[in-house]
C-alpha cells in the first residue's frame, strides 16, 4: 500500500471537523491500493491498481498476464487434434465449450459438417457447460456480496454436471472430448434419462436461488445502479455475452449466426434494461433456464446415426474397425502421425460461450499445422472496460462489479 508523503492534520476545531465530515471536495491526497493478483474478489490472478480518494476510486489500472502460457504459439507448433487438450485450459470452468468452438473452427477450414447426432451431442455438451459455468458464477457472486448459503445450493448442481461429464467424456474437469470431425465417444442412454431428471431438479434450484437473493434487500442494494454500462459503451468496448445483453442488446450468436443446428431449437434470449450488476446477474439466471429448455429439446429429438464424420480422410476410424480392417489401421496411423491435412486459407469461427463470444482465427498454408492461430477471448474484451467503469465507485463496490462480469483468467491471459 502506497500513500502520499504529505501529512494530513485533522483540526481540533468543531468547524473544521464539520467541514471534513460533510464536504464532497477532494482532500488533495490519494492512496494507491493493490487488489490482487492473489485476492478472492478477483476470481483468479487479476491485479487491479486502484487510486483512491478516501473510499472513492479515482482510477483503475487492470494488470493481466499472470497466467499467460503462450497458448496461441503452442497451437502453431502442433497438429490440430493435439491442440484440443490445451483448449480445456482456456475457460477451465466450461472446458467442453472451448473444445467444441476450436473443433468447429478447424472443421470450417476443412469444409466439414458433422452428422446430425454428432451436432446434437455437441449442443448437449455446450448447454451443460453453459449451465455449469453460470451456476458457479451465480453461487460465487453471492459469496462476493455476503450470501454464503446460495453457493452451497449452486455447487451441488454443478457437481451433478461434473458427474455427467465423467459419464460422457471419462473426465470430470479437463475433458478433451472433441476431435476434429467428431468426438471421442457416444452418450450413454442411461445418462440422457438422468439429465432429464437433473433438468427438473435444477429448475427448482434456480427458483430457490432467485428467491434467496432477489428478495434480499441488502443483495439488491449492493447491485442495483452499480457498474452501469450503457448500450453505446458496451458496443464500443467490444463486450459480448450476458454482459452485453444485460445492457439491452439482444445479440446471441446462437440466434444471429446459428451453428451445430441451434436453429432447430426454441429458446429465448434474455436481455436487461439498465446494464448494471443486477441486470448481469438476472440475465444469467434466465439464461440457465433457457439452457435447460434446450437440453430437454436435444434429448427429446436426439437422432440416430454416427457421431463422427464417416470415412473421411483425416478423421479417426472406429476402434473396432482398426482391429479388423487394414485400411482403417493405416488411416489411424496416418491421421495420428501426420495430422489433418488442411487446405490453405483463412477462417474465423465464433461461438456463444458462457463468458461471451469465443472466436478462433486460423490462417493455414496447407498441411497439418496452422500458420497462425488467434483466439478472441471474451473475458479479455469484457475486462477492458474496467478503467472507465470503476471510476467514481467505492472500494466496497469492487467485488460486486468484478463478480458481475463472471470472467476467467485462464482464457483472458491465454
UniProtKB/Swiss-Prot annotation:
InterPro entries: NADH_Q_OxRdtase_suD, NDH1_su_D/H, NiFe-Hase_large. It is a peripheral membrane protein. GO terms for molecular function: NAD binding; NADH:ubiquinone reductase (non-electrogenic) activity; quinone binding. It catalyses: a quinone + NADH + 5 H(+)(in) = a quinol + NAD(+) + 4 H(+)(out). It holds the Pfam family Complex1_49kDa. The keyword Ribosomal protein does not apply. The keyword Translocase applies. Its EC number is 7.1.1.-. Keywords: Cell inner membrane, Cell membrane, Membrane, NAD, Quinone, Translocase, Transport, Ubiquinone. It is found in: Cell inner membrane. One of its GO terms (cellular component) is plasma membrane. It comes from the Bacteria. Belongs to the complex I 49 kDa subunit family. NDH-1 is composed of 14 different subunits. Subunits NuoB, C, D, E, F, and G constitute the peripheral sector of the complex. NDH-1 shuttles electrons from NADH, via FMN and iron-sulfur (Fe-S) centers, to quinones in the respiratory chain. The immediate electron acceptor for the enzyme in this species is believed to be ubiquinone. Couples the redox reaction to proton translocation (for every two electrons transferred, four hydrogen ions are translocated across the cytoplasmic membrane), and thus conserves the redox energy in a proton gradient. This is NADH-quinone oxidoreductase subunit D. It comes from Akkermansia muciniphila (strain ATCC BAA-835 / DSM 22959 / JCM 33894 / BCRC 81048 / CCUG 64013 / CIP 107961 / Muc).
